[in-house]
């Protein structure tokens, strides 16, 4: 009995520590009714790209409900989608800092072994960011994925006369890009 209570406490602590930190829950849609616990659902969350000021990503993913979710023993499906949009009049970033692919979102999708992640990739020649969402496991991940691309030229172009830029910065569409120092 003590072992069962200990496992329940441990799983509750892990559930409290997990999740997509730094996200705002936008909403959810119920997909399957469960008599015990929450219903299976699709959740939508928003989070700002930590290195690109003015870009917000929206992610939707399947969330398993029921009694297993209550004790954090469920395993969510690998179905997810991501979309990123401009949410400020101008976008600013340092090209050196975003040059390498980076994980910008991570959320546990099972008790221990499965995670849902969003990776950001940057194409410097086109000034385009690609965001890919996928899930993985310790042993084997899933090939299911979704991606979105965001260009500096998507929004209204900045007026160079009205925007102050530093000598190591350039304006590309709605983006102010800080270039590497030589």
Go through the PLM ranges and name each one.
Residues 2-8:
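Sec-dependent signal peptide recognition
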Residues 10-11, 50-51, 77, 145, ...:
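Residue-level signal for mature regions of secreted extracellular proteins and peptides
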Residues 15-16:
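C-terminal motif of bacterial Sec signal peptides marking the signal peptidase cleavage site
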Residues 19-20, 59, 86, 154, ...:
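Disulfide-rich extracellular modules and peptides
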Residues 22-83:
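N-terminal secretory signal peptides
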Residues 56-125:
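Mature extracytoplasmic domains of secretory-pathway proteins
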Residues 126-182:
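C-terminal partner/receptor-binding element of secreted or periplasmic proteins
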């Amino acid at each position: 009995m003590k072992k069962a209570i200990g496992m329940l406490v441990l799983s509750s602590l892990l559930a409290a520590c997990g999740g997509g930190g730094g996200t705002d829950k936008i909403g959810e849609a119920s997909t399957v009714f469960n008599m015990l616990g929450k219903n299976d659902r699709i959740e939508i969350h928003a989070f700002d790209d930590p290195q690109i000021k003015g870009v917000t990503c929206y992610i939707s993913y399947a969330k398993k409900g029921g009694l297993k979710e209550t004790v954090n023993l469920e395993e969510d499906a690998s179905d997810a989608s991501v979309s990123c949009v401009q949410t400020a009049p101008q976008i600013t970033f340092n090209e050196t800092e975003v040059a390498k692919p980076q994980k910008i979102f991570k959320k546990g999708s099972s008790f221990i072994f499965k995670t849902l992640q969003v990776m950001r990739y940057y194409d410097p020649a086109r000034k385009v960011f690609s965001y890919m969402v996928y899930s993985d496991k310790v042993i084997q991940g899933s090939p299911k994925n979704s991606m979105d691309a965001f260009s500096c030229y998507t929004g209204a172009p900045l007026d160079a006369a009205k925007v102050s830029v530093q000598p190591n910065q350039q304006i590309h569409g709605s983006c102010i890009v800080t270039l590497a120092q030589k």
